[in-house]
């Protein structure tokens, strides 16, 4: 059995509720959690002024000393420099056996997923990190179906993680529920944000908006081969508009 700590975090291109871009705050939250695998959404790579033109994926991979696997949702070439990229980053300290970037179907803002087969004791753990459509349940349904197509055959350990822009019981996630279980519900122990104004909402896994969370849309789905020993909503309020979700897994 390999114990794996995974964190999924929509980092809002490093801009916090004070409207400041400060990637060091993101790195600090992640370093404190010390995850084996990090699934990041809304990551800029030399995108533009909103994130000071930096390669956020590379900087975070270096800061955390993790291997980077990437999938662009938006990629625009430039004549005078590196391409303008925005999408999903997977950072891992576990060895990567295979990885691939996948475009997802749907209308509106382009969406993507990154898939990595990670080496664990006695086999592999497939992790798919993604960010689904924010404005169309129909698009999310098509994207969920596509995610199922990225999973390994039944009987092999798999995780899907990211900002799915809908709750775990949403109709459009029916394809996922056919193969995977909601990790928060499966967790042996759960810890929510313990702010005083949120006392009546503890144990709900609310992650968005960070200032006063009312939605559980940052989700981790696990196959039956994966045991969820714990789950916690971390505090991302100073560095993003989402809180990170941490899950501890036995694979």
Set out the residue ranges of the language-model regions:
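Acidic beta-strand-to-loop metal/phosphate-binding motif
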Residues: 38-43
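Active-site regions of metal-assisted phosphoester/phosphodiester hydrolases
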Residues: 1-37, 62-63, 67-251
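Short, flexible/disordered intra-domain loops and linkers
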Residues: 45-55, 80-81
